[in-house]
Amino acid sequence: MSKIEHDRTHHAAKATGIGDPQCFHGEAGPAKFKVGDEVRVRNLPDLFYTRCQVYTRGAVGRVTEVVYESPAAEDESWDNTDQPEWFYSVVFRQKELWPDYPDLYENDTLETEFSERWLEAP
Amino acid sequence: MSDMQMSNVIDGQAAARLDTAPISLLEKVRSEGRVWTDLAEEYGVTNPDPPWKITLEATCDLLAEAECALPALERRWEEDELSEERYAGVPFPERQLLALAHSMIRRGLVNEGELAKRMQQVHERLTQV
Amino acid sequence: MAEGHTHPAAPMVDEVSDFEVLEMAVRELAIEKGLFSADDHRRWTEYVHTLGPLPAARLVAKAWLDAEFKKLAVRDGVKASLEVGVDWINGPPTGFGTPSDYCNLRVLEDTPTVKHVVVCTLCSCYPRPILGQSPEWYRTPNYRRRLVRWPRQVLAEFGLQLDPGVEIRVADSNQKTRYIVLPVRPDGTEGWSEDQLAEIVTRDCLIGVAVPKPGITANATRPVHPAVHPVHHEH
């Protein structure tokens, strides 16, 4: 790859042949939540850049997978990769996300991922 | 949350920083350039995409990767904003290309003058007999 | 047309468009300014050229034929991808995945009571290494905003209507995971080979906006209308 001053060389050295997010395996410490846990999405202030969709804020869902360790997107965009977190796949009932979602489709759900900082016990 | 609120929040972050005012060089390309769907029809070519679509994708990937000059998420937010406000009605991928050039000019990665000059040189190179 | 040829030359666009010129000019300036190298660009272009939906279709066909492979696909999408020739980690020129695709494929298994459909509301992320380039409609704010909110309506527009009791699960790939859908194997495919099965698993089936059907081997063509008004209808 080309010469860089952004820290992509460091990332390349760490991740080549291993993959991203695989290269952060083992760095996050114990996972706070496990599969089956109910979690609420926190409404943290967005500084500038977030991958936590506004439509999920405040909603309660259930952890369906503990997926990988990685720096949170909010840190990674500033090249702050020192403290990876656990990421979780969370399933929500659509009715929970959109109060006027039709009752006829009460089984419909939505699944999306969050880094640990965005979740709390309900 | 209403759809309007949702779209404002998704787009608002990049839109706050992006100047969508027209850039005359790109407006010229937009009005005078021939889009692939027209060219393909005229020449009877069945490929749905222009040959430069893939090189454009590679450029977008590398801008996000090599120097992180234009991270993917921001480029896409700006592309959404520009697609709605400035380049609505332009077919994809011409729209993606115009949005990329617009983002790059506004970020100072290239300037309009040098881009115009380079376009002239490229055009001469490609059309010389 | 040259004499002696029995077949006419393939038609070519014999004209230089300003868009073609703009793309090249942008790329050349970017290289001169050191934003990336010409070598990197050539390698990336070669890589992107290799990408298409066939490996994902074969992954589904294999999973339909082999229960153990299906379990692997659901448990470890990256490992299962290797068996259809896709290496999420070493395939891209970086050696650690691409900056927008990463290396965490999850295969979402449909059942008779759960139907998955994939979107990326934030930026239209897509599992390119196994599925190729995303279609234009997938990238539009129209699809991205509406699918999470009105999935039934959007799917109906794609010609897919499901029983109200079925759980439609929208997967929003907002972080590093990329998804493909493993649809339910349709009736009428008993005794089919892997090739025959792969042929009916179209890109749209793998995104989740269509279901595989014997005899249907192409994505439905969709006219794309630029959104004149932003979407906020009420139902």
What does each model-found stretch correspond to?
Chain C
Residues 2-235:
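Terminal, compositionally biased segments used for targeting/anchoring and flexible tails
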